[in-house]
Curated annotation (Swiss-Prot):
The keyword Electron transport applies. The keyword Transmembrane applies. This is NADH dehydrogenase [ubiquinone] 1 subunit C2. It is a single-pass membrane protein. Belongs to the complex I NDUFC2 subunit family. Disulfide bonds: none annotated. Keywords: Electron transport, Membrane, Mitochondrion, Mitochondrion inner membrane, Respiratory chain, Transmembrane, Transmembrane helix, Transport. It is found in: Mitochondrion inner membrane. PANTHER family: NADH DEHYDROGENASE [UBIQUINONE] 1 SUBUNIT C2-RELATED, NADH-UBIQUINONE OXIDOREDUCTASE SUBUNIT B14.5B. It comes from the Eukaryota.
Length: 119
């Protein structure tokens, strides 16, 4: 195994990550981070003793956008790291097929028990 996943120093997303599909904008993790941005705007208003929900709506929108944007790239990086790990794992499986024998395929009839309805 490689100790360091990203061999290029100080690269958050290598060029190789561009070949992956982008994360969906409706990903729950992104929506959650956007909500955290909104809550951080509310907490900022609370700390500075402003009206909590109505003061600085532009600031709250900025926090939502910034957190959503940061979450988008964090999810993109996570997907890239999973893709690299999967590529290494499948490469290993391809080089060592004796360690991963094919299992015989079973039908559903062999897996499930016979069904006897209760009258």
């Amino acid at each position: 195994m490689i100790a360091r996943r990203n061999p290029e120093p100080l690269r958050f997303l290598p060029d190789e990550a561009r070949s992956l599909p982008p994360p969906k904008l409706t990903d729950p993790r992104l929506l959650y981070l956007g909500f955290l941005g909104y809550c951080s705007g509310l907490i900022d208003n609370l700390i500075r003793r402003r009206p909590i929900a109505t003061a600085g709506l532009h600031r709250q929108l900025l926090y939502i956008t910034a957190f959503f944007f940061a979450g988008y790239y964090l999810v993109k990086r996570e997907n890239y790291l999973y893709a690299v790990r999967d590529r290494e794992m499948f490469g290993y499986m391809k080089l060592h097929p004796e360690e991963f024998p094919e299992e015989e395929k079973k039908t559903y009839g062999e897996i499930f028990e016979k069904f006897h309805p209760v009258h």
